[in-house]
């Protein structure tokens, strides 16, 4: 009887050969590219007079460096304009499908691919971006890769990788009202640590995961990399299939029937052998906020920032650095920390469901006069849907700036940046030093609903006070 995990099954299906040294050559089913990590890869192909091996398995969009305040061409930022033009040229030359600004389907690559039905169970997916693990929410195995591997996939449709171990993270019970997928994944990373996943794929499972919507599952898998894992995935189920059905790039008619039959066979066996199993009680998770300079440094809304004596020797070193950088003191409560900027968006939390929950918190309320707040839809499709539902007006009426799709302040490669030592309440995925554009800017990660609550009060707040 088979004892394979979904990871084992997908890996073996895509294994081309065993390479000298013990790594495997893995076929990539879908290659996603964008304007930042692809130019050098295309340049390397040109230097060797090579073509893209399977252009029909490659899809491009622009997201990282695009402005969100004004997307009229040419951009004011000459570098951004040059990078977009380069991607346009490369896609045209190699006959690659490209979702450009104004196509109706442009946006953050990890938002666009699922909403178009490109992301499907059983796939191997690669992209020159660390949050490619997002696509594992559909039962695919998705890896972030570097520019040299982007080159390899363009040229051969394969990459060389060592097979990962698999850790199952079993989440019992279900999340309480006012607690979201972002809170759960921050809690998981805090419990396990930011390096615990090195060499692992994370399989998220259990009743709490089953309860989540597909967009919430994407949030969980998106931040696998923040826990050190190369990828994270969830076994596909009826929610998965319903989400994909009738999407623009989903299989149609008899091809859908064939795909569905295969997808239903793709799950970890009941007696799968895991390299490690972790069990957590999701019902005990509360709204969670990061206080430090790694996503693992988080606490519940009513908790105090840890004392040094309560930390391990390794954690003490990072904590001391975080106290100084963030201007926090050990034992200080995170609640009521003043914030200067509130950002809702990113590939972690820039989807329509994220905007809906934030809008519910903001409706008939006003952003604090001391706060600059802006919302950046994850894609043109998300923006269109939000406008049809009137969400954009709720945001604007409250005092949020409504922006155009892009990665924006998640990594601050455009003009959306913190200034000086501003404190940001952010729905993004990383709180490293300088991550949001200012060398001394400070980032507090939280759910979109928590960002909305912080925007109203001008300080870190418990969103349950707004929705219960």
UniProtKB/Swiss-Prot annotation:
Which top-rank group of organisms is this from? Bacteria
The cofactors named for this UniProt entry are: [4Fe-4S] cluster
- An example Pfam family from this entry, by short name, is Aconitase
What EC number is given for this enzyme? 4.2.1.33
Cofactor binding: number and manner: Binds 1 [4Fe-4S] cluster per subunit.
| HAMAP family registered for this protein in UniProt | LeuC_type1
Provide the organism lineage as a comma list. Answer: Bacteria, Bacillati, Cyanobacteriota, Cyanophyceae, Synechococcales
Quaternary structure, per UniProt, is: Heterodimer of LeuC and LeuD.
- Keywords linked to the UniProt accession: 4Fe-4S, Amino-acid biosynthesis, Branched-chain amino acid biosynthesis, Iron, Iron-sulfur, Leucine biosynthesis, Lyase, Metal-binding
Q: Can you tell me which residues bind [4Fe-4S] cluster?
A: 347, 407, 410
Query: Under which name does UniProt file this protein?
Result: 3-isopropylmalate dehydratase large subunit
Originating species: Prochlorococcus marinus (strain AS9601)
UniProt entry tagged with the keyword Signal: no
Q: Which reaction does it catalyse?
A: (2R,3S)-3-isopropylmalate = (2S)-2-isopropylmalate
* Gene transcribed to yield this protein: leuC
């Amino acid at each position: 009887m088979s004892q394979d995990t979904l990871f084992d099954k997908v890996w073996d299906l895509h294994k081309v050969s065993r390479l000298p040294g013990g790594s495997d050559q893995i076929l990539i089913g879908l290659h996603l590219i964008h304007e930042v990590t692809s130019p050098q890869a295309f340049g390397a192909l040109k230097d060797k007079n090579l073509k893209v091996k399977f252009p029909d398995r490659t899809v491009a969009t622009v997201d990282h460096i695009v402005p969100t305040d004004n997307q009229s061409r040419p951009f004011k930022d000459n570098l951004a304009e040059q990078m977009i033009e380069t991607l346009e040229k490369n896609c045209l030359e190699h006959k690659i499908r490209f979702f450009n600004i104004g196509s109706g389907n442009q946006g953050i690559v990890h938002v666009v691919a699922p909403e178009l039905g490109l992301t499907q169970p059983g796939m191997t997916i690669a992209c020159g971006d660390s949050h490619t693990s997002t696509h594992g929410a559909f039962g695919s195995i998705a890896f972030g890769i570097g520019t040299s591997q982007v080159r390899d996939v363009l040229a051969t449709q394969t990459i060389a990788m060592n097979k990962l171990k698999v850790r199952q993270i079993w989440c019992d019970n279900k999340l309480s009202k006012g607690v979201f997928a972002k809170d759960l994944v921050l809690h998981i990373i805090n419990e396990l640590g930011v390096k615990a996943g090195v060499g692992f794929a994370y399989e998220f499972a259990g009743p709490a995961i089953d309860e989540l919507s597909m967009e919430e599952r994407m949030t969980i898998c998106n931040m696998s990399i923040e826990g050190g894992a190369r990828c994270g995935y969830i076994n596909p189920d009826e929610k998965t299939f319903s989400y994909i059905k009738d999407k623009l790039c989903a299989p149609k008619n008899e091809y859908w029937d064939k795909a569905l039959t295969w997808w239903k066979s793709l799950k970890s066996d009941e007696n799968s052998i895991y390299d490690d199993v972790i069990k957590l009680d999701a019902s005990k998770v509360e709204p969670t906020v990061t206080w430090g300079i790694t996503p693992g440094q988080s606490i519940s809304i009513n908790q105090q920032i840890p004392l040094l004596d309560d930390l391990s020797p390794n954690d003490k070193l990072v904590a001391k650095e975080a106290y100084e950088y963030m201007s926090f003191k050990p034992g200080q409560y995170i609640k009521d920390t003043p914030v200067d900027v509130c950002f809702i968006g990113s590939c972690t939390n820039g989807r329509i469901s994220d905007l809906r929950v934030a809008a519910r918190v903001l409706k008939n309320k006003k952003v604090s006069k001391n706060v600059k707040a802006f919302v950046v839809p994850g894609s043109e499709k998300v923006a269109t849907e939000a406008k049809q539902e009137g969400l954009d007006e709720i945001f604007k009426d409250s005092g949020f700036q409504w922006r155009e799709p892009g990665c924006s302040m998640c990594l601050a490669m455009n003009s959306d940046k913190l200034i000086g030592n501003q404190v940001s309440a952010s729905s993004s995925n990383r709180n490293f030093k300088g991550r949001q554009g200012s060398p001394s800017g400070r980032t507090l990660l939280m759910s979109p609903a928590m960002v909305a609550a912080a925007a109203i009060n001008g300080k870190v707040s418990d969103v349950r006070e707004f929705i219960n």
